[in-house]
Design a protein with these regions (language model features):
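Gly/Trp-centered helix-boundary motif
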Residues: 1-214, 271-339, 459, 476, ...
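Positions in alpha-helical segments
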Residues: 92-96, 221, 245, 304, ...
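Glycine/tyrosine- and acidic-biased, solvent-exposed loop/turn segments at the edges of beta-strands
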Residues: 199-284
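Alpha-helical transmembrane segments of integral membrane proteins
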Residues: 309-531
Length: 531
């Protein structure tokens, strides 16, 4: 039953991905291969490569290839008998041992839940609304590639032709002339390229004294009056609840036109150089509507920011979520590449030996002596900006990441090729490829399973390190390393560095617990006894 369910889910995902691409849908996780194919030039075919395409048309072959692989995998599982997929008794015992190691077992469950949350994508985190009900029609902006302009939902002026600001629509939902319903994700901010407005908290006037947000202490600091669109109108310094210091004022176009100086609540001088009179300018916002503005990085629990914002104005929770998605996608791309290369080279070295083994070892030694950081710096300088991205960084990591496993695979292959079953296969006429794939490779399963968790931890740590140093992903990718760098440069805002630290350490601990438990469960010496 589980086999058929997994097969049907794979087939359904492939069909939904293909249908979504044809209809312009943007489905969580399923549409990601097509998005990558559109962003990376060599993963799609334009009219320059395929002359039969229209001038504005392209074929995202990488996305279609991924959907085809999902479909074939589902069909393969569906037609295979359940008994053929059953684990051998040796590996079934290892799985049972792993379940008995509670630290690793619960870490695996927690990591699976985290991956499931990351797969929900724009359903949980994003600035686009999930559903909008307006004028008797339903819209799903988060699930379509098309940009819906603001005039579709009643926005006017400069916002009419630009993409609708769904956070503004959410605030005005239910009012006459505005959408009846706007359903936003749990975190209504994009991980990157989405600057949140400054969070504000209202201050209270009593008996001519301005009180802090607790309502008991006279306010000390900067207080502001804001336009309805969130732009700053006036900013005044207060001491002991009365104006004392400089005051500044701006028009809606952010032009500074007003300045004044107060001492102990008394106006000393003022200067106004805008339209009309100063009294008309001061009356643009309601008197007594002073509020406390939290500039970026804003602390946690201000506005709608559970963990606050970073210095660029991005919501930290959304940024951490985006960084988690980047790490998972990087691992899903990086691991198959390095294990394919490492297993292939290692098995060939161990099986053939001789000069091939000797030459390959020397090549590995030469490559391993290259300074990785210098290579990254040189490539970052020479590669055009539009070519930089996740694939470039993963290519550099994969160039150095496959070598550490080749010696383990080589040693195991040299041991297995001397077994009687390999000699019997040769006598029966089996070729080299058949022996390597059907007889030797299955016996390397324990090595692969043991190394995978540590490879995941390595790629997460490598991406964070490169981004921390400034040689990693571009700014349109969320990165825990860049957030850590931002927090360490602003230690007066400890919530920034602590968020990045706990996210990075927590994920590495989970993966390490899983890896150690797998190693312990597959270790034959733990269950060997000597007399």
């Amino acid at each position: 039953m589980t086999k058929n369910l997994i097969a049907l889910l794979l087939i359904l995902a492939a069909l939904m991905g293909a249908l979504g691409e044809l209809n312009g849908w943007l489905l969580p996780t399923i549409s990601w291969p097509f998005s990558v194919s559109r962003d990376v030039p060599f993963l799609n075919c334009s009219e320059r490569v395929a002359p039969f395409l229209a001038a504005d048309e392209q074929v995202n072959w990488f996305g279609w290839l991924c959907m085809l692989l999902l479909l074939l995998s589902g069909l393969y599982l569906l037609i295979r008998r359940k008994s053929s997929l059953r684990l051998p008794p040796k590996y079934a015992k290892q799985v049972e041992r792993f379940r008995q190691i509670k630290r690793g077992y619960w870490s695996l469950i927690a990591f699976g839940v985290i991956m499931l949350l990351a797969a929900m994508d724009q359903c949980l985190v994003g600035k686009r609304a999930l559903f909008v009900a307006y004028d008797g029609e339903w819209y799903c902006p988060a699930f379509t590639r098309a940009v819906i302009p603001g005039n579709t939902f009643g926005l006017t002026g400069a916002e009419a032709q630009a993409e609708a600001d769904y956070r503004v629509l959410k605030e005005r939902a239910g009012q006459p002339g505005w959408p009846q319903l706007v359903l936003m994700p749990l975190v209504p901010y994009d991980p990157t390229m989405d600057v949140a407005p400054f969070p504000t908290e209202s201050l209270e006037w009593r008996d001519g004294v301005l009180y802090d947000t607790d309502g008991e202490t006279p306010y000390n600091g900067l207080a502001s009056r804001m336009y309805k669109d969130g732009q700053m109108h006036l900013r005044q310094r207060y001491r002991k609840g009365v104006p004392d210091g400089h005051m500044q004022g701006w028009l809606r176009n952010r032009q500074e036109v007003y300045s004044a100086l107060y001492e102990n609540g008394n106006l000393v001088r003022e200067h106004y150089r805008g339209p009309k009179k100063a009294e008309d300018f001061l009356a643009l916002t309601k008197q007594g509507s002073e509020c406390k503005v939290y500039y970026h990085p804003a602390p946690p629990f201000t506005g709608n920011h559970l963990l606050g914002t970073n210095s660029q104005g991005a919501d930290i929770l959304a940024y951490l979520y985006g960084g988690l998605q980047v790490n998972i996608k990087a691992a899903l791309i990086y691991l198959p590449v390095i294990y394919f290369i490492g297993l292939t080279v290692g098995m060939l070295m161990g099986y053939f030996g001789g000069k091939f083994d000797l030459v390959t070892q020397r090549i590995i030694e030469i490559i391993s002596q290259l300074p990785f950081l210098f290579v990254v710096m040189i490539v970052s300088d020479f590669v055009p900006l539009q070519m930089r991205g996740l694939f470039l960084i993963l290519s550099l990591l994969a160039m150095f990441g496959w070598m550490h496993m080749t010696y383990l695979v080589r040693t195991a292959t040299m041991k297995e090729k001397t077994r009687d079953y390999v000699a019997a296969a040769k006598v029966m006429g089996a070729g080299t490829t058949h022996i390597l794939l059907r007889h030797i490779l299955p016996n390397l399963r324990s090595i692969v399973v043991t190394l995978v968790p540590f490879s995941v931890a390595a790629v997460i740590l490598s991406l964070a390190s490169l981004d921390y140093l400034g040689f990693g992903l571009p700014d349109n990718y969320a990165s825990w390393g860049r957030l850590l760098n931002d927090g360490l440069s602003k230690l007066s805002s400890p919530w920034v560095v602590s968020s990045a630290f706990f996210a990075l350490v927590g994920s590495l601990l989970l993966v390490t617990f899983i890896g150690e438990s797998i190693r312990e469960a597959t270790d034959p010496r733990r269950h060997s006894y000597y007399e």
